[in-house]
């Protein structure tokens, strides 16, 4: 299944969480969780997929997805996140970074 579809479904189902860094960026830019969720649901494509190494020894590599999308009010938001798996199953989408697009 397309990663953007999987991300949007996780967001719509409320299966997402924010890192402390993402929360600080959101606060600095005056964004709320709904702004970030709207921007992801309204996104038309994934801007970039980054391969990264996980700090967990059981996970060899993971992908970070960079998404630019707009809120219903027209504000462009940048977000970067990854899927978190537990027992081999995608549990939720974890947002590492969320801020106004520059």
Question: Model regions: which residues?
Answer:
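Ribonuclease/tRNase effector modules and their secretory precursors
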Residues: 1-102
């Amino acid at each position: 299944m397309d990663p953007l579809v999987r991300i949007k479904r996780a967001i719509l189902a409320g299966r997402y969480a924010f890192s402390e860094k993402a929360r600080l960026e959101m606060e600095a830019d005056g964004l709320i969780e709904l702004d970030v969720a709207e921007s992801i649901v309204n996104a038309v494509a994934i801007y970039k997929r980054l391969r990264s190494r996980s700090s967990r020894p059981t996970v060899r590599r993971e992908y970070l997805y960079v998404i630019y999308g707009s809120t219903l009010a027209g504000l462009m938001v940048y977000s970067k996140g990854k899927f978190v798996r537990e027992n081999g199953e995608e549990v939720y989408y974890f947002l590492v970074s969320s801020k106004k697009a520059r």
